[in-house]
Design a protein with these regions (language model features):
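Conserved, structured core segments of small domains
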Residues: 1-118
Length: 118
């Protein structure tokens, strides 16, 4: 079994769609996420994951300069992640197929976790 990170990215379009949602629409969207993640967990493939707030800090360079970030000007904003344990990358991609982020023009990046203890 291999671990993969499913990295969720909101585009400016998807971020605007979230901002325009009524509380009822937001709850319906949250229910879709919970259903999708619950399905992955029910298969025993969920390792963990979280949603991320839109603001944070960025530390850059050898002087480790701290600035506000991520930047609003960016085309994509990392909005959350899941870590899954599956047989191969194709299975990780298949799990991402039902992600609700696609409904609002967001994307999922599937990345293998690097094993460092081998």
């Amino acid at each position: 079994m291999e671990k993969y990170l499913l990295l969720f990215r909101n585009s400016t379009v998807s971020e605007e769609a979230y901002q325009a949602m009524s509380p009822e629409e937001m709850q319906a969207n949250l229910d879709l996420w919970n259903q999708w993640i619950g399905g992955i967990a029910a298969q025993g493939k969920l390792v963990g994951g979280e949603a991320l707030k839109n603001s944070g800090k960025v530390i850059n360079g050898s002087k480790q300069v701290v600035t506000d970030g991520p930047y609003v000007e960016s085309k994509e904003l990392v909005s959350g992640f899941l870590m899954v344990q599956v047989d191969n990358q194709e299975e990780a991609i298949a799990l991402s197929a039902g992600c609700p982020i696609y409904d609002i023009e967001g994307s999922v990046e599937v990345r293998p976790i690097m094993l460092t203890n081998q």
